[in-house]
Amino acid sequence: MAVDLLLGLQWGDEGKGKIVDVLTSKYDIIARFQGGPNAGHTLEFDGQKHVLHTIPSGIFHDDSINLVGNGVVIDPVIFKRELDNLAKHKIDYKSKLVISRKAHLILPTHRLLDAASEASKGKAKIGSTLKGIGPTYMDKTGRNGLRVGDLELEDWKDRYRALADKHEKMIAFYDVDVQYDLKELEKEFCTAVDTLKELTFIDSEEYLHQAMKSGKSILAEGAQGSLLDIDFGTYPFVTSSNTTAAGACTGLGVAPREIGEAFGIFKAYTTRVGSGPFPTELFDEVGERMGKVGNEFGATTGRKRRCGWLDLVALKYAVQVNGITQLIMMKGDVLSGFDTLKVCTAYKYKGKEITHLPFNIESGNIEPVYTEVKGWEEDLTKMTDASSLPKEFNEYVDFLEKELETPITIVSVGPDRKQTITR
């Protein structure tokens, strides 16, 4: 069987965790293919809220295997905290969680390097989550990294020491004030590694190949969003991995011909955490209202998200680079009560009106061109089927479908897995 993809189409925080949780019953394997603990997937069900950072969102379902792919970077300390939380909720994770031997490990010194690098940039900071993601991927591409499979070797601590010593020299080079107790951090790290070694390590590309041969259904779960992709995002305000569809192939060892459906997920408006360009950002009471009603705070950092109207220019771009076959719209309920909604359908750029994402969309270079759409008053959170949705809401969705030339097959009207409507 083919591998289906679930990809965020904006700057992350689209609601992928909830939708993976909703879709999981259709799949035998849920696989994460990139990113690390800089991502946060929030799931709500049975009156409880759960946040996952590295573990795939299918872990709460009994019949699915959850795979952490080679493209993921793992912080054993944060991973252990996730496992401890699952154990507290009596989730039997050991029987349904497998980890690629080729996944790279985030060391304590990676996090310190991240902090030192960000501090050295002054006003040019890019808004790093300070989780050590960038330095870990740098070691990966620089062929210096420590991988999960190395933990099975007798000399893994020697390999760790050599890399950590190199990092300490680099931290000193930045000449910034970063306070830390490395011995204490390493003690915590080694304890977490012991927990990690209790799990099943696999050669994930072979595992997935055999799964496909035997007819298993697989969903590849992306982290963050397409506009944060290292190549196709709003560089340099991006993450350190490929968050787009192609990243699933390299992050899991899956051939392009094996890709099936590509589900693209987006909010009915736009948000962004941290620094970087955001053409439709709102600085008025409308943006404040979106943030308050939508509870827009980062699941990983707790930072307040910037809010704005839906940007169809950027969204079309994301649909294009990912080859999206079906769209999923989240948080339609947040827009209830607005008389009029605005949607950015073009940019004014260098004196011209354009409908594509240019190389540089930094503030001042781009002016959004808006199309107005009639809003709706009804509270969507109590609605359970498509026939009950208000006319104006359906007109909004129809307008987006036409502009994006892609069907919107699912809409979310609340955080709980039950607040999901198939169209």
From Swiss-Prot:
Upper lineage: Bacteria, Pseudomonadati, Bacteroidota, Flavobacteriia, Flavobacteriales
Any one cellular-component term (Gene Ontology): cytoplasm
GO biological process: 'de novo' AMP biosynthetic process; IMP metabolic process
Protein name: Adenylosuccinate synthetase
EC number of the protein: 6.3.4.4
Pathway: Purine metabolism; AMP biosynthesis via de novo pathway; AMP from IMP: step 1/2
Co-factor binding comment: Binds 1 Mg(2+) ion per subunit.
Function text: Plays an important role in the de novo pathway of purine nucleotide biosynthesis. Catalyzes the first committed step in the biosynthesis of AMP from IMP.
NCBIfam families (UniProt xref): PRK01117.1, purA
Species assigned in the record: Christiangramia forsetii (strain DSM 17595 / CGMCC 1.15422 / KT0803) (Gramella forsetii)
PANTHER family hit by this protein: ADENYLOSUCCINATE SYNTHETASE (PTHR11846:SF0)
Pfam families given in the database record: Adenylsucc_synt
Subcellular location: Cytoplasm
Gene (UniProt): purA
Cofactor(s) in the UniProt record: Mg(2+)
Catalytic residues in the record: 13 (proton acceptor), 41 (proton donor)
Keyword Heme applies: no
Reaction catalyzed: IMP + L-aspartate + GTP = N(6)-(1,2-dicarboxyethyl)-AMP + GDP + phosphate + 2 H(+)
